[in-house]
């Protein structure tokens, strides 16, 4: 493809010596211990690399947003001592970036008229592995079936095999056959909202993000994002996925599993005892502190030591 992404939409990728990280929470409620762990890891990695740390509110899914949650999140980060560089950004204000990405992708994107029921009904034609992964069967890949109107936009994944491999700084080599494990995936949803995979890649590219540190629950999404980066001509960031926090039932700690806000007006002492210190321990750091400033002074070298333990060859 000879066309280029407009310079006004996507920033040029900075030199690899310039570290630019980010924390990108969804405003579906206040931050809890699980999201604090992800924020802490990304913040510490940026600061130990003498880089910048940005905050992006991923409010592209309007149906799930909780009014005021974005401001609560920003306030919680400040109370915890995690101050970001520059201005926070909101995905809901960046639709032009996502539309520019769709335009650039051109024929790699096609309209899909399938409902969830249509896809479920077609699962029996797939291999057991694809059916279990809910891989899209390609019903609309070569055109909409008669009488079926377009609902969403999907990205074509090369067939029959297309393996994406990358080295994660925590988990090492990760490989995924997109055609077999993901299939053609949605980039714009039937409800009109931009899909997460497209929005996050477009924003990371436009903001020049060089390093992505986040929870391991997003490890499976990374190959799709790398494929989008390749199609959009964006440099691939370095990735570090940290283990997600689990509750006493072994479930990922989340709002859906009853996770409580870590910042509910607690005192500094309570914030340390119930949030910052437990988050550091979950990541594998032995940090002792009596104040928030003291915590971060101790956490920086502790993170360096932790990363030495998890150093992956070539990273």
Describe these PLM feature segments.
Residues 2-6, 10-127, 216-234, 287-294:
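N-terminal Rossmann-like or analogous alpha/beta NTP/dinucleotide-binding catalytic cores
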Residues 31, 191-193, 265-271:
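Structural motif
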Residues 68-174, 181, 292-299, 303-315:
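Active-site neighborhoods of enzyme catalytic cores
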Residues 115, 124-125, 220-221, 231-315:
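Catalytic adenosine-cofactor/nucleotide-binding cores of aminoacyl-tRNA synthetases and other
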Residues 118-264:
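Active-site cores that bind ATP or allylic diphosphates and position pyrophosphate for catalysis
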């Amino acid at each position: 493809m000879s066309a280029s992404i407009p310079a006004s939409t996507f920033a040029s990728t900075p030199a690899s010596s310039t570290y630019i990280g980010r924390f990108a929470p969804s405003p579906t409620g206040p931050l809890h211990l699980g999201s604090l762990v992800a924020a802490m890891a990304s913040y510490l990695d940026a600061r130990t690399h003498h880089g910048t740390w940005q905050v992006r509110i991923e409010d592209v899914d309007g149906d799930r947003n909780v009014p005021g949650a974005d401001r609560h999140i920003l306030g919680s980060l400040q109370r915890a001592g995690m101050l970001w560089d520059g201005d926070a950004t909101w995905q809901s204000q960046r639709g032009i970036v996502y539309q520019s990405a769709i335009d650039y992708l051109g024929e790699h994107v096609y309209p899909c008229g399938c409902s969830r029921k249509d896809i479920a009904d077609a699962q029996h034609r797939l291999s057991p592995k694809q059916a279990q992964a809910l891989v899209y069967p390609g019903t609309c890949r070569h055109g909409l079936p008669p009488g079926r109107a377009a609902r969403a936009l999907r990205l074509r994944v090369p067939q029959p095999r297309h393996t994406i491999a990358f080295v994660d700084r925590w988990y090492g080599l990760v490989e995924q056959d997109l055609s077999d494990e993901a299939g053609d995936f949605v980039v714009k949803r039937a409800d009109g909202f931009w899909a997460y995979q497209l929005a996050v890649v477009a924003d990371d590219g436009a903001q020049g993000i060089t390093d992505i540190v986040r929870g391991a629950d997003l490890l499976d999404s990374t190959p799709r994002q790398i494929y989008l980066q390749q199609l959009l001509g964006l440099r691939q960031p370095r990735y570090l996925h940290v283990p997600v926090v689990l509750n006493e039932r072994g479930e990922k700690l989340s709002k859906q599993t009853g996770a409580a806000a870590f910042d509910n007006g607690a005192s500094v002492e309570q914030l340390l005892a119930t949030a910052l210190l437990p988050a550091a321990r979950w990541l594998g750091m032995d940090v002792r502190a009596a104040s928030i400033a003291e915590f971060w002074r101790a956490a920086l070298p502790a993170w360096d030591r932790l990363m030495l333990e998890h150093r992956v060859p070539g990273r």
